[in-house]
Amino acid sequence: MAFSPNVLLGGRVCAAVARSGFATRRVTIPGSTSREPDPDFDWEPEERELQEVESALKRQKKAIRFQKIRRQMEASGAPPRTLTWEAMEQIRYLHREFSESWSVPRLAEGFDVSTDVIRRVLKSKFIPTLEQKLKQDQKVLKKIGLARSIPELPGPGDSSKPLSAGQSVSGSLLIPGDEASSRGHGHSTALKAIELNTQSTNITTRQTERNKGVQGLEEGKDFVPVAAGHPTSTCRGARGIDSDGLPSDKRLEELKAGEAGDQIFSKRVVQRGREFFDSNGNFLYRI
């Protein structure tokens, strides 16, 4: 019986020590920074949610501070426009239809602008009028040094007057975002049409030059001496050529027999077009 009270007393002491150790884990002394929280301690769900909210607030404060510093460093007002309305429509279309492959960084790299410009374009819902589009595009093209022949806008009194044929606006400025997929096909079709027109022009020029050359050759043929253009019967008889321009039978016999009269002909005959000459350059006959 005397042993049992000691056992009970020892059990109570152990329980008190255990309770005091558990309490030291949860209760911290004010002003004491030496004790660190136990990483193995299982926090309550409410405490975890509180920590998540605190971390989110810290991140939000950092972002707000960064935006303030950035606005102070940058120039006031909207940044200068560097994209045409056609390019902005293409950016919106690519991001809307192919958002996975065309992310904001890739769009910024493809259009050679910063990611902030891409975000401003995607965030903007402003729909300008045709006059505003033309004015802004003209400014952008002048700034980048690629000013094209954009038609001048009519005055305030001529707003209801349609543009003439020479002042028709380029179709690339009027295509909406839903039709941006057909721009590449239309551009290639236009290039093919230009190539076909160039080829047809070249072919026409070649045919004209060829006709001029043939006409010049015909004029050269007609421009011959009278004796050669209209040979007399005496010349025909001497050369053995009949009225058709072909050698006579007698002349052929003389050529075959080698009796060429006073002229010495070679057995080798050279053909030049429709005329035949010997190796010495003497005219034989014409076909």
Curated annotation (Swiss-Prot):
The keyword Nucleus applies. GO terms for biological process: cell differentiation; mitochondrial ribosome assembly; positive regulation of mitochondrial translation. Plays an essential role in mitochondrial ribosome biogenesis. As a component of a functional protein-RNA module, consisting of RCC1L, NGRN, RPUSD3, RPUSD4, TRUB2, FASTKD2 and 16S mitochondrial ribosomal RNA (16S mt-rRNA), controls 16S mt-rRNA abundance and is required for intra-mitochondrial translation of core subunits of the oxidative phosphorylation system. The keyword Mitochondrion applies. One of its GO terms (cellular component) is mitochondrial membrane. Glycans are attached at residue 202. Residues 149-169 are annotated as: Disordered. Belongs to the neugrin family. InterPro entries: NGRN/Rrg9. It comes from the Eukaryota. Keywords: Developmental protein, Differentiation, Glycoprotein, Membrane, Mitochondrion, Nucleus, Secreted, Signal. The gene is NGRN. Pfam families: Neugrin. GO terms for molecular function: rRNA binding. This is Neugrin. Residues 1-23 form the signal peptide. Forms a regulatory protein-RNA complex, consisting of RCC1L, NGRN, RPUSD3, RPUSD4, TRUB2, FASTKD2 and 16S mt-rRNA. Interacts with 16S mt-rRNA; this interaction is direct. It is found in: Nucleus; Secreted; Mitochondrion membrane. It comes from Bos taurus (Bovine).
